[in-house]
């Protein structure tokens, strides 16, 4: 083999070797915004933190603490829900809030009327009881009391009627108070959900917490 053939074979071999070597570009680091999955994971972490805060707080013995736990749960639910569901619940919650506030105002008026009824019944019951007690102490009042049979029956009837009204109005007032507490808790939950759903978040927890509205505050 002559030198020309050797040189030709060598050049062909080097060309094939260079052709099969892959080109690896240098790495570049681009600053990118958080992806949707990362943002969802962050919001789920915040939701879990809110639930932990609600569970680790003091046992909700009072109505205010129970409302606080309900608000924590509503905010955690808002952060956990996907965006379309969150917006749907937000619109429904805004409409429901109007009806709940109207129902709350109606129940408060009923409770005020019952308080007036309880006060009047209590005064009449106390007065009739005092008349009956004085008739036992004073002989002259007892004599007049026995001579006027209609007066005795009227006083006893008023006492019995007002006592019954007093007991019934007290039970109804207690039930209305329970409904008021439950409605206020529902309002706090929906207002907290709407507030959390209305916030825009870029990943900063401090910015997230600035827009939170709790209950009727």
From Swiss-Prot:
<comment type="similarity">
    <text>Belongs to the orbivirus NS3 family.</text>
</comment>
<comment type="function">
    <text>May play a role in the release of virions from infected cells.</text>
</comment>
<protein>
    <recommendedName>
        <fullName>Non-structural protein NS3</fullName>
    </recommendedName>
</protein>
<dbReference type="InterPro" id="IPR002565">
    <property type="entry name" value="Orbi_NS3"/>
</dbReference>
<dbReference type="Pfam" id="PF01616">
    <property type="entry name" value="Orbi_NS3"/>
</dbReference>
């Amino acid at each position: 083999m002559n030198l020309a053939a050797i040189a030709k074979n060598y050049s062909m071999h080097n060309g094939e070797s260079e052709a099969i070597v892959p080109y690896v570009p240098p790495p570049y680091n681009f600053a990118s915004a958080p992806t949707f999955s990362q943002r969802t994971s962050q919001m789920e972490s915040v939701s879990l933190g809110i639930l932990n805060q609600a569970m680790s707080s003091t046992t909700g013995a009072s109505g205010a603490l129970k409302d606080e736990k309900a608000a924590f749960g509503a905010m955690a639910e808002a952060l956990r829900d996907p965006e379309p569901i969150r917006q749907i619940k937000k619109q429904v919650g805004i409409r429901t809030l109007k009806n709940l506030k109207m129902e709350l105002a109606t129940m408060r008026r009923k409770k005020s009327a019952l308080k007036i009824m309880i006060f009047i019944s209590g005064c009449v019951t106390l007065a009739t009881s005092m008349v009956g007690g004085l008739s036992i102490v004073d002989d002259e009042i007892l004599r007049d009391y026995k001579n006027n049979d209609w007066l005795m029956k009227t006083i006893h009837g008023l006492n019995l009627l007002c006592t019954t009204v007093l007991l019934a109005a007290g039970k109804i007032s207690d039930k209305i108070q329970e409904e008021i507490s439950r409605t206020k808790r529902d309002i706090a939950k929906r207002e907290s959900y709407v507030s959390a759903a209305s916030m825009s978040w870029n990943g900063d927890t401090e910015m997230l917490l600035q827009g939170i509205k709790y209950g009727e505050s």
